[in-house]
């Protein structure tokens, strides 16, 4: 009876608590409503900026070309250039008359007082003419 020790056995209890692991995606992969709206307006503003730049470039190119044309002296005298511009607006006149054998009284009464004339502008393909 005396061979056992009177000290109690110590028991070590270990409890492991693990934090709940959530599989979260990075912040930039989870867009919010505000971020989508901001991206939309940024895209619209960027598009307007690009269109404005293209417009200004085209406008400045037109100014460069028009100022280059006014600085170059014309190779021909101005009187000849003005006569060419008047000649470029040439009109043709044509009168259509129906054949007499196929016309009836209705068309004969209406077409007797009228003389239809067709005007057509003739385009000149000479590139030496100044543009208005």
From Swiss-Prot:
Residues in the signal sequence: none
Record's keyword annotation contains Phosphoprotein: yes
Keyword Transmembrane helix: yes
Entry's Gene Ontology cellular component terms: membrane
Keywords from the UniProt entry: Membrane, Phosphoprotein, Transmembrane, Transmembrane helix
Chief subcellular location: membrane
Protein name (record): Transmembrane protein C1orf162 homolog
Protein's organism: Mus musculus (Mouse)
